[in-house]
Regions:
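C-terminal motif of bacterial Sec signal peptides marking the signal peptidase cleavage site
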Residues: 10-13
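Structural motif
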Residues: 132-133, 148
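Post-signal-peptide N-terminal segment of Sec-exported extracytoplasmic proteins
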Residues: 32-89
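Short, Lys/Arg- and Gly-enriched loop/turn segments at beta-strand edges
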Residues: 142-149
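Catalytic cysteine-centered active-site loop
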Residues: 80-131
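Aromatic- and glycine-rich peptidoglycan recognition patches
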Residues: 15-37, 150-192
Length: 192
């Protein structure tokens, strides 16, 4: 009986704890974060151990949240008038002005023509595009339009964009011969 008790103590004392939280100043395996209560004068930091899986999950969650916020924000401007060179909801938007306005409102400052925006981020296959990614349209000589992906499934892709004919609107580009024939590529400027 004593040996069974000794074995139980030995097993439990050597088991790694999954909820270990360490604080310290010099641990190189720990992640450094500003304490939520810190100010410019108060430079205290908290340290806690994180696994790479936890970090990747947190980053993915934050990226997904930003993507959702961008799409929901863009949809709110549905019906806003088109204006060539327009960059605000009060005066109206052109396609690149609308895209720049939405992304800047969410902490990703971008501006410029569709051609300039196409040079940002990482190009992706059509099938890999996620909500919040940008899609570009035109012909072999020129990029003429940019839109924000609202949803992308195996069956259809919807975008939010500002068009000359209707201002800000949502379009299913999968069922549109016009948009399909002009589709060039997509770009991810959210993931880092």
């Amino acid at each position: 009986m004593a040996s069974l008790l000794s074995l139980a103590v030995l097993v439990t004392s050597c088991s790694p704890s999954t909820n270990v939280r360490r604080t310290g100043k010099y641990s190189t395996a720990n992640k450094r974060e500003k304490a939520s209560h810190s100010t410019k004068e108060d430079k205290k930091y908290t340290y806690h151990k994180t696994s790479s899986t936890e970090t990747k999950t947190t980053k993915t969650s934050k990226t997904s949240a930003i993507r959702e916020e961008i799409v929901l924000s863009a949809i709110q401007y549905k019906g806003t008038n088109y204006r060539s060179g327009g960059k605000s909801p009060t005066t109206g938007f052109d396609c690149s002005g609308f895209t720049g306005y939405i992304f800047t409102q969410h902490g990703i400052p971008i501006s410029g023509s569709s051609d300039k925006l196409a040079k940002l981020g990482k190009q992706k296959d059509k099938e890999s595009l996620l909500p919040g990614d940008l899609v570009f349209f035109g012909n072999k000589d020129r990029i003429s339009h940019v839109a924000i992906v609202a949803s992308n499934t195996t069956d259809e892709m919807e975008v939010v964009h500002s068009t000359t004919s209707a201002g800000v609107k949502i379009d299913n580009i999968t069922n549109s011969e016009y948009w399909q024939s002009r589709f060039l590529f997509g770009v991810d400027i959210i993931s880092k």
